[in-house]
UniProtKB/Swiss-Prot annotation:
Residue numbers on the Extracellular membrane side: 21-141, 201-211, 276-291, 354-368
Gene3D superfamilies: GPCR, family 2, extracellular hormone receptor domain, Rhodopsin 7-helix transmembrane proteins
Annotated protein name in UniProt: Calcitonin gene-related peptide type 1 receptor
Keyword Membrane: yes
InterPro entries linked to this entry: GPCR_2, GPCR_2-like_7TM, GPCR_2_calcitonin_rcpt_fam, GPCR_2_CGRP1_rcpt, GPCR_2_extracell_dom_sf, GPCR_2_extracellular_dom, GPCR_2_secretin-like, GPCR_2_secretin-like_CS
Expression (tissue specificity): Detected in gill, brain, heart, intestine and testis.
Family that this chain belongs to: Belongs to the G-protein coupled receptor 2 family.
Keywords: Cell membrane, Disulfide bond, G-protein coupled receptor, Glycoprotein, Membrane, Receptor, Signal, Transducer, Transmembrane, Transmembrane helix
Species this chain originates from: Paralichthys olivaceus (Bastard halibut)
Gene behind this protein: calcrl
Chief location of this protein within or outside the cell: membrane
Amino acid sequence: MVVLILLCDITKFFVEGSLGSNETEHQHPTNVYHDVGVTRDKIVTAQFECYQKIMKDSTHSRQEPLCNRTWDGWLCWDDTKAGVISEQHCPDYFQDFDPSEMVTKICADTGDWFLHPVSNRTWSNYTRCNQHTNEVRVTAMNLFYLALIGHGLSLTSLLISLGIFFHFKSLSCQRITLHKNLFFSFVLNSVITIVLLTAVANNQEVVQSNPTSCKVSQFIHLYLFGCNYFWMLCEGIYLHTLIVVAVFAEKQHLMWYYLLGWGFPLIPATIHAVARSYYYNDNCWISSKTSLLYIIHGPICAALLVNLFFLLNIVRVLITKLKVTHQAESSLYMKAVRATLILVPLLGIQYVLLPYKPEGRVSSEIYDYIMHILMHYQGLLVATIFCFFNGEVQAVLRRHWNQYNIQFGSSIGNHSDALRSASYTASSITEVQGCYSIDGHTEHMNGKGCHEADASILKSDNPFA
């Protein structure tokens, strides 16, 4: 949570800087009434379209009572049969209006629109549009804090995981290097998401002033969002090349993985930014009601599908090898593939659910909670599966914990127990290898194989140094 507090301080600085850069704009009253101007433009446009529709549509023959088509000031109503209640969705002119709710207008049996008993004028019932406004605001705040907590937990777990990977040199190998880059992409994404949530989405002044910095932040956010999924694809490609294509090759060139993980997401992010500036240039690019987001989501979905294909093919190959040879190395590879195979559907399920948002208020609220959990707790999930549940990491931590107990144990009994435990752990390290090897081949990093690193620990004159 300390990380979250520091990010909030950074966010405050970001907001002050953004507002300071637009101080001259705030001196003009037009920005104060920005929302009023937008609302007025929407209403005028809707009124113009309504009158055009009224003039173009053919009139019905009056064989039965009929309420005439009309414009009520906010919405356009078609001809309605007598005794029928006409309905349509609430307009999005005002922030406290819920477009999922319905407006009603009653056509009386006489063929006249309902007159309000107090004003004695035709009346449309808009009361349901803001009936649940307070509940919607509470839900929005709950989702806001749910996202902040999710990214705070993700940041904490990811930074701890990166600390473990960098501190323990026995874990250094190409596969762990890919893990580090994947974790780092999630760290950066969580940081920029917290900045956007607190400095932009939750600050109407920044959104109304529409500084360039908030659009740049949105661009960085979408770029890093793509990096998350393409580094997951790198994990799948690496395992597929190692196990299927190169038949347990010793070493791969990581430069191509860096280009795919950090370089390729720049392409859809840049195309989206250019298209957004020309075709849907809303304030801070904060709206999600545009099909231009498919420029970002399309490559991500493709990466998920390709990754799933690679992983299923890897599982097929490993199962075949296990049936034929019963090699222990194949079993070790299966454990690594299993972790990635679990993550891919979990990280991609949001795109399966995205088109199926329900219409009802309660069901829509449940949907929003599920989507926020799936989206904002991904970093925590990745750190848990790839680091905290990793047998190699657990073995290394257990061994160093036992070394600590031996060095700082307060009694002979504790020293003896820790020594026996350390001896058992050291012998088990040969079973849980830091990096996989097949037929004597070892994955190398920085000129030193992982077997060599483990061997140097086990053969040292002072194993606890």
